[in-house]
């Protein structure tokens, strides 16, 4: 039988053989364990730097190419009636389309490495045109017209009177260094205005070439002889071969340079090439006048 003290709650035995010295149960303060500094499982871990992984550029390009092919060929509209998968040939159909099918060679597809275009999805042709289904009726003419090639009207070779006057006035202003005159619009192809004679080109005495307008007879005001042939801007320069030797030194040849004539207001057209285009590669002094000008395509027309 044990008795407990109220203060210490120490068991006291009534028997001497079971006596035990009284001890206090007062708790002694100790440092808390290190569990407070351990990782807290209930706290969300923060962001950490991912390890730098090696990226193969070739594999990346291959993946990109495959993604582009999938997007291009499968289409973005699920209900589109023309999926390319519908037109790939299965081995049986490819065998029937094979020209050697009737020759008794059924293993031609398996042995021919160049025959994969019949069944491949991307780098291949699709089915033959005879295998393609008809266009849906609800598509209407809009689908048919979208697939037709555009036919452009032919370029007219001859110009009407209004266009003729525009081009001729431009040429006259370039040759005389004058501003463009005011053009009165006219509709339709009418006869040339009174006092204008048809021409097919003009000659430049400076360059010695004949300039023509392709596909038209343009009209220039004034007599034909004065409008067709430009006034000579520079006389023929004698060269070393054509000049006699100088008198003060025997056996020496030199070129005689004559000054430019001052009676013509326009600068030398030989070097004024702002409205000209040089052609012929290394060929000198060969120009084509815009628009639609071709040099040396017509013979030399004399005044009539």
Swiss-Prot record:
Localization (cell): Cytoplasm, Cytoskeleton; Nucleus; Cytoplasm; Mitochondrion
Q: Which GO terms describe its molecular function?
A: alpha-tubulin binding
Q: Does the keyword Nucleus apply?
A: yes
What InterPro entries does the database record attribute to this sequence? SPMIP6 (IPR028195)
One GO CC term on file = nucleus
What's a GO biological-process term for it? spermatogenesis
Which keywords fit this entry according to its UniProt record?
Cell projection, Cilium, Cytoplasm, Cytoskeleton, Differentiation, Flagellum, Mitochondrion, Nucleus, Spermatogenesis
Q: What is its main location?
A: cytoplasm
Which proteins does it associate with, and in what oligomeric form?
A: Microtubule inner protein component of sperm flagellar doublet microtubules. Interacts with alpha-tubulin.
UniProt family annotation: Belongs to the SPMIP6 family.
What does this chain do? May participate in intramanchette transport and midpiece formation of the sperm tail. May play a potential role in somatic cell proliferation.
Per its record, how is this protein called by name? Sperm microtubule inner protein 6
């Amino acid at each position: 039988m044990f008795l407990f003290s109220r203060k210490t709650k120490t068991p006291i035995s009534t028997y001497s053989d079971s006596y035990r010295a009284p001890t206090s149960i007062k708790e002694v303060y100790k440092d808390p364990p290190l569990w407070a500094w351990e990782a807290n499982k209930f706290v969300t871990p923060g962001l950490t730097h991912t390890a730098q992984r090696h990226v193969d550029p070739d594999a990346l390009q291959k993946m990109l190419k495959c993604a582009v092919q999938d997007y291009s060929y499968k289409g973005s509209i699920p209900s589109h009636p023309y999926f390319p998968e519908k037109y790939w040939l299965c081995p049986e159909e490819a065998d029937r389309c094979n020209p050697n099918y009737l020759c008794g060679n059924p293993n031609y597809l398996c042995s021919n490495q160049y025959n994969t275009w019949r069944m491949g999805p991307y780098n291949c042709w699709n089915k033959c045109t005879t295998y393609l289904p008809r266009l849906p009726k609800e598509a209407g003419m809009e689908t048919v017209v979208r697939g037709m090639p555009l036919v452009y009207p032919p370029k007219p070779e001859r110009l009407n009177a209004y266009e003729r006057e525009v081009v001729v006035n431009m040429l006259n202003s370039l040759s005389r260094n004058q501003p463009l005159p005011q053009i009165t619009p006219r509709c339709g192809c009418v006869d040339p205005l009174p006092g204008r004679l048809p021409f097919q080109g003009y000659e430049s005495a400076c360059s010695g070439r004949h300039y023509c307008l392709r596909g038209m007879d343009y009209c220039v005001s004034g007599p034909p002889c004065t409008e067709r042939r430009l006034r000579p801007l520079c006389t023929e320069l004698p060269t070393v071969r054509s000049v006699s030797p100088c008198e003060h030194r025997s056996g020496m040849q030199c070129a005689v340079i004559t000054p430019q004539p001052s009676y013509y207001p326009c600068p030398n057209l030989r070097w004024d090439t702002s409205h000209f285009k040089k052609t012929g590669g290394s060929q000198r002094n060969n120009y084509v006048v815009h628009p639609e000008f071709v040099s040396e395509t017509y013979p030399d027309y004399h005044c009539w």
